[in-house]
């Protein structure tokens, strides 16, 4: 989105793979992102939604996987993803104490969408992930409401904002402002270009550890600035999308490489950090009402996975930096 400079606009190039058109998760065809931001004296928070497809994700599910690097988190929906290897819901991000109401809103939205298509829902697995924004936001107010989720869904676009928007409004990263960031990479396989995209909700890390393009700049910053934390209490949610044909097992292997990008920026995955990766591939569709007993799933040659691993790592690193560099100053409620 025009107006905000991203990390590459400052001459900092992350990695070596080519980037997508927008250099965002939405470079994966069909993916859109929407925000609703709450910015009052008491509350600096919101909700961000990732729509995996322009169609009905419940009726036509995608192959999916999750990985918990450090489990100090309250993300809803990972158990079924791990068991079945499919995604049947939009993905919503919010603050820790608003997971319940956002979960309810995603259920209501999906029921209504399916009702219009004469699809009956008896079981459904919403995906709602969170980070704790209580440093800047009076989190006990639980300011996010169902109508905010619906508005974020309605406003979802390809070229979405980053920084202190939506769920990222009250987030902090390396003791500086964090929030929503994204990046994408192009991978060539069998002469065809595929896309890997990442969106992060960054809320983690110490200032002294902040590293950009291999250079530790955080140590000098920490010496000059006061009020930085000594305990890593934050989290990061990483959503990884691709159009590469992957099985759930292969996708899980790939999304683990987000940890490489995290480490490159200086995260040490502290005790109080919830580091959650959620991934999906748009290449294989699993029909909700599939009549066949046996279905075919396309998969990638295992020996060629290294480029996918590299793409995820590069996207994660750049997405975190974009989440910080695009964020505006936010004054908390305290």
What are these regions (language model features)?
Residues 1-334:
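Alpha/propeptide regions of enzymes that mature by internal proteolysis
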